[in-house]
């Protein structure tokens, strides 16, 4: 279903659906319930532990987890075991019974992730060394520079001149709401701006849009000044990216109204009601450099389309492949298109009128040990500066006996 994920058991019988995402579904030993991790925001693993019966009655067993990965039923089916943390990255093993009584079962330095539980009670788990970092380059540079800050840095956007990057720090030191920071690509230390998840730079570079816990939209000054709150206008949850129109007075973002799937909106920073510019289920909203179009992705088809900001029928983007990431160049007739990869990514310059594609750049890190993928590939409008994120995971597998 557009804009929603569904949990089915058996196949075709819908038990639960959400505008967020579902992970680690496990059927109970009796086959009468499904336990799963329920994440309210796409690509963020914070969330709750839930169970749903075959009639579709869902219950939350444990909530408030900043990161949750891995879940399994106990052999008797009286508890759900999972790995999670309330802050940072170092997950522990917890057990919760069907009445919501929670207990900690196991922890280890560096954190662990539950993989499975055997019928005799033995646990299969991994001890993980995880890191999310940022690499980038500027005009004239002979090699890429590591622009990471702490242990979980995610690039979000580049300044209009391509010299600065705004990013999130989401790891152990990022805090419960994460931290928004900026950094000069040429080597200056990071400068924290405040709590939240970052959006883009304003056209004059003086502000960065951000959200706090996905529910409050704020503007953070990049220099002296105080932050500003923007009225939600009925938006229950914000998605990313959050970008500016060229006039510097309006923001473009994906958001969810009560009971609705995510869609793209435009809103004046002085407040007022957000205006929907795409149907539900269409997100990843990128304004064109002339402010006339919103490029966005249909979650059902994974296909990018162009939506006129002033209304009218959307149009296809010839040459853009389903699932490809895209961003605008400084010329509204062209886009950069790329597909995330594990160890390398090819970036194409795409003529959105003719569909002609030309290889523009290939990104390949020098150290591919433990790489899980490259993501968040961001280019300046002129294509001369770029940054990208990488995730590295090194794991040791353990069999644990004797836990109760």
Protein language model annotation of sequence segments:
Residues 1-17, 353-362:
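Short, solvent-exposed linear motifs at loop/edge-of-secondary-structure regions
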Residues 1, 15-39, 44, 58-83, ...:
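Conserved beta-propeller blade repeats
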Residues 9-12, 53-57, 97-101, 138-142, ...:
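Short loop/turn segments that connect beta-strands within beta-propeller blades
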Residues 39-42, 85-87, 128, 139, ...:
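Short polar/acidic secondary-structure junctions
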Residues 3-8, 44-50, 88-94, 131-136, ...:
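Structural motif
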Residues 123-125, 132-145, 165:
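An edge-strand/N-cap motif at the start of beta-rich repeat modules
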Residues 344-393:
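C-terminal closing repeat unit and adjoining cap/tail of repeat-based domains
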């Amino acid at each position: 279903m557009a804009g929603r994920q569904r949990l089915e058991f058996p196949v075709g019988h819908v038990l639960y659906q959400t505008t967020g995402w579902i992970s680690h579904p496990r059927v109970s030993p009796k086959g009468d319930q499904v336990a799963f991790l329920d994440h309210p925001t796409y690509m963020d693993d914070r969330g709750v532990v839930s169970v749903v019966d075959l009639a579709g009655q869902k219950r939350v067993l444990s909530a408030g987890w900043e990161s949750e990965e891995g879940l399994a039923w106990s052999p008797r089916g009286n508890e759900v075991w999972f790995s999670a943390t309330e802050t940072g990255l170092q997950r522990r093993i917890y057990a919760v019974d069907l009445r919501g009584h929670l207990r900690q079962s196991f922890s280890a330095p560096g954190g662990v992730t539950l993989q499975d539980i055997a019928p005799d009670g033995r646990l299969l788990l991994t001890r993980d060394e995880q890191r999310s970092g940022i690499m980038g380059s500027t005009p004239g540079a002979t090699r890429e520079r590591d622009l990471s800050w702490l242990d979980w840095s995610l690039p979000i956007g580049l300044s209009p001149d391509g010299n600065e990057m705004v990013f999130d720090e989401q790891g152990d030191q990022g805090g419960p709401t994460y931290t928004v920071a900026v950094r000069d690509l040429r080597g200056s230390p990071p400068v924290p701006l405040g709590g939240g998840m970052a959006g883009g730079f304003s056209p004059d570079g003086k502000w960065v849009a951000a959200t706090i816990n996905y529910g409050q939209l704020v503007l953070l000054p990049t220099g002296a000044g105080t932050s500003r709150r923007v009225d939600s206008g009925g938006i229950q949850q914000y998605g990313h990216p959050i970008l500016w129109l060229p006039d510097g007075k309006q923001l473009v973002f994906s958001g969810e109204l009560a009971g609705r799937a995510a869609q793209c909106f435009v809103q004046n920073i002085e407040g007022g009601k957000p205006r929907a510019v795409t149907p539900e289920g269409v997100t990843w909203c990128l304004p064109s450099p002339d402010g006339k179009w919103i490029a966005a992705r249909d979650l059902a088809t994974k296909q990018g389309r162009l939506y006129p900001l002033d209304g009218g029928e959307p149009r296809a983007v010839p040459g853009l492949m389903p699932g490809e990431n895209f961003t605008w160049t400084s010329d509204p007739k062209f886009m950069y298109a790329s597909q995330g990869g594990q160890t390398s990514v090819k970036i194409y310059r795409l003529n959105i009128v003719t569909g002609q594609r030309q290889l523009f750049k290939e990104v390949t890190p020098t150290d591919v040990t433990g790489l899980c993928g490259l993501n968040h590939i961001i280019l300046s409008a002129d294509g001369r500066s770029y940054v990208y994120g990488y995730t590295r995971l090194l794991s040791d597998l353990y069999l644990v006996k004797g836990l109760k």
